[in-house]
Swiss-Prot record:
Family: Belongs to the UPF0352 family.
Gene3D superfamilies, per the entry: YejL-like
Protein name per UniProt: UPF0352 protein Patl_3379
Disulphide bonds in the chain: none
Signal peptide extent: none
């Protein structure tokens, strides 16, 4: 997912690598991977985002995700 971020490319790539390795280690199917990642995202929203900002942030996240998967 393309991003403009305060995080370095290296830091981002390292986190992505670790997530992918974990999914591969458990031989997670596409559906299981999406379920697990969805639950991780939900947990992040519930634990790290103020309740008053969750809906707006979730909408923005969804828009970025759709833009990313529809990019040609």
């Amino acid at each position: 997912m393309p991003q403009n971020s305060k995080y370095s490319d290296t830091q981002f790539e390292n986190v992505m690598h670790d997530i992918i390795i974990a999914l591969e280690k458990h031989q997670a199917s596409r559906d299981l991977s999406l379920m697990a990642l969805g639950n991780v995202i939900t947990n992040i929203f519930m634990q790290q985002v103020n309740e008053s900002q969750r809906s707006e942030m979730a909408d923005k996240f969804t828009q970025v995700l759709l833009k990313s998967i529809n990019a040609k």
